[in-house]
Every structure is written in structure tokens, then in C-alpha cells.
């Protein structure tokens, strides 16, 4: 029987107090309370399209702005993801996804490599989506990548509506993550690396 791939992480600093939980083999259920509505909407895309159960509770210094909240949630989720994934034996490791939303199209390619790296090629058509600063999208992914130790390439190939651009990115990320962590029946107990470790 396959072990449960889930984890919980708490992160407390002078800027944020965060508790996250993730189940890599979930059903897409999310319980999100970051205090930033649009960000919760994007995290829901990861859960729903990644078929992962994700819980986020955050109290952040939103009287300043959302930067610390978004970045620190990325860090905590990256830590929880790495913890839940365990030794990585049997996973597919590499994956990609293209997701459209009306005029927008994004591509996400990732490698659960053990080496953190982010290539973020997105030119948003405006600086804010409602009250949400679009610069924080890359901050979230940088925080996640650094602590999940994955290589992640994000490209928005086209788009005129900034909300659509962001949503296609998060949906594609969820779908690619789901595919990469999937257990390959031909790789049971095998590390997906010629080095023997990731």
C-alpha cells in the first residue's frame, strides 16, 4: 500500500504567522485564508487543477502590503511540498502543461530536480489586478521553488487580460505539478535519476 504523501508546516516570523497543509494525492479541496482574496483564488487553482488538498492559514502584515504574506506562503508551501514528497522514488519527475483562458495562454515546465531554479517570463498587461500587485506572482513562485527544490519555467505566451494571464499560470502550474508527482507504475521504488538521488 502506498504511503500517504501529506505534510503540515508552520512558519512564524515578525511579518507573518502561517500554517499550511498539503496532500499530494487529494481531490482538489482547498481551505484558504491568506487575507488576500485574489491570492486565495490563485491558490485554489493549484489545488483544483493539481488534485491536491491544500490548506493555508496566514496572519500577515497586510497593513504594509501583501508582499510578505504571498512570499512566505510560497516558502511554507514549498517546504510542505518537499516534506510530503519524501524520497521521490517512483515519481515521473518531469512534466509540462499548457492552459488557455480565452485570449491568454501559458506554459509551465518543471523538473523535481533537487535544484531550485525559476525562469519567469511574463509581461503582465497591467500592474495590479484589483488590489493585487502582479509582481507578487513571481515572488510566490520564487519562494516555492527555493524550498521545494524544483526547477520551474513559466512562460505566458499571450494574453491581454492580466487576470487571465495570472490564472492560466496558476492552473498550468497545478496541472504540471500533478503530473510530475504522479507515481509511475514502471518506476516503483526507483529513483528517477542516473545519480541515484534527487
Swiss-Prot record:
Pathway: Amino-acid biosynthesis; L-histidine biosynthesis; L-histidine from 5-phospho-alpha-D-ribose 1-diphosphate: step 6/9. One of its GO terms (cellular component) is cytoplasm. Pfam families: IGPD. GO terms for molecular function: imidazoleglycerol-phosphate dehydratase activity. Keywords: Amino-acid biosynthesis, Cytoplasm, Histidine biosynthesis, Lyase. It is found in: Cytoplasm. It catalyses: D-erythro-1-(imidazol-4-yl)glycerol 3-phosphate = 3-(imidazol-4-yl)-2-oxopropyl phosphate + H2O. Its EC number is 4.2.1.19. Gene3D superfamilies: Imidazole glycerol phosphate dehydratase, domain 1. InterPro entries: IGPD_sf, ImidazoleglycerolP_deHydtase, ImidazoleglycerP_deHydtase_CS, Ribosomal_Su5_D2-typ_SF. GO terms for biological process: L-histidine biosynthetic process. Signal peptide: none annotated. Belongs to the imidazoleglycerol-phosphate dehydratase family. HAMAP family: HisB. This is Imidazoleglycerol-phosphate dehydratase. It comes from Methylobacillus flagellatus (strain ATCC 51484 / DSM 6875 / VKM B-1610 / KT).
Amino acid at each position: 500500500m502506498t504511503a500517504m504523501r501529506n505534510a503540515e508546516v508552520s512558519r512564524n516570523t515578525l511579518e507573518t504567522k502561517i500554517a499550511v497543509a498539503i496532500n499530494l494525492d487529494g481531490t482538489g479541496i482547498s481551505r484558504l485564508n491568506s487575507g488576500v482574496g485574489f491570492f486565495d483564488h490563485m491558490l485554489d487553482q493549484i489545488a483544483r487543477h493539481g488534485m491536491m488538498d491544500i490548506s493555508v492559514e496566514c496572519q500577515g502584515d497586510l497593513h504594509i502590503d501583501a508582499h510578505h504574506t504571498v512570499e512566505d506562503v510560497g516558502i511554507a508551501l514549498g517546504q510542505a511540498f518537499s516534506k510530503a514528497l519524501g524520497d521521490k522514488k517512483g515519481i515521473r519527475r518531469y512534466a509540462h502543461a499548457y492552459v488557455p483562458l480565452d485570449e491568454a495562454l501559458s506554459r509551465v515546465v518543471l523538473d523535481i530536480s533537487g535544484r531550485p531554479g525559476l525562469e519567469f517570463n511574463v509581461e503582465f498587461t497591467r500592474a495590479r489586478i484589483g488590489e493585487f500587485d502582479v509582481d507578487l506572482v513571481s515572488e510566490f513562485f520564487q519562494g516555492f521553488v527555493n524550498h521545494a527544490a524544483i526547477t520551474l519555467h513559466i512562460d505566458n505566451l499571450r494574453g491581454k487580460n492580466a487576470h487571465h494571464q495570472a490564472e492560466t499560470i496558476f492552473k498550468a502550474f497545478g496541472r504540471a505539478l500533478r503530473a510530475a508527482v504522479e507515481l509511475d507504475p514502471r518506476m516503483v521504488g526507483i529513483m528517477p535519476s542516473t545519480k541515484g538521488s534527487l
